[in-house]
Design a protein with these regions (language model features):
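N-terminal Rossmann-like NAD(P)+-binding domain of SDR-like oxidoreductases, especially those catalyzing
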Residues: 1-134
């Protein structure tokens, strides 16, 4: 069997991210997860392993820490990134606009710059239905 490329899933311990990680592993991809656990729990990695029989590579990293993300990319063979990591609570974003700006925009810019620096040509950005409110 030909080895499929390594894929980094940011926000991979969140609901959508973790389900995506399971599907990618089941399709034979080498999957890596970066998540700072601000909206999820590390036990999700254990659940992914229990479901798939494979434990994804994991880093508890804040995407605003560009050098830590760079080091993770240096260690792991990543050829694509699926970006789910973002804050999404509309009400909270009004109360904490700078925190949301840093988390949602600065981290995205870091990833895009790191893609260029590491010759990663495949990038998927996903939003959330919660941005539309209730």
């Amino acid at each position: 069997m030909i080895k499929k490329p390594g894929i980094l899933v940011t926000g991979g311990t969140g609901y959508i991210g973790s389900h995506t990680v399971v599907e990618l592993i089941e399709q034979g991809y080498d999957v890596f997860v970066i998540d700072n656990l601000s909206n999820s729990h590390a036990e999700v990695i254990d659940s992914i392993e229990a479901i798939t029989g494979t434990r994804p590579g994991y880093g508890n990293i804040d995407l605003n820490n560009k050098s830590a993300v760079q080091e993770f990319l240096r260690i792991h063979k990543v050829e694509a990134i699926i970006h789910f990591a973002a804050f999404k609570a509309v009400g909270e974003s009004v109360d904490k606009p700078v925190e949301y700006y840093r988390n949602n925009l600065v981290s995205l810019l870091n990833l895009i710059e790191l893609c260029k620096e590491n010759n990663i040509k495949n990038f998927v950005f996903s939003s959330s239905c919660s941005v539309y409110g209730e």
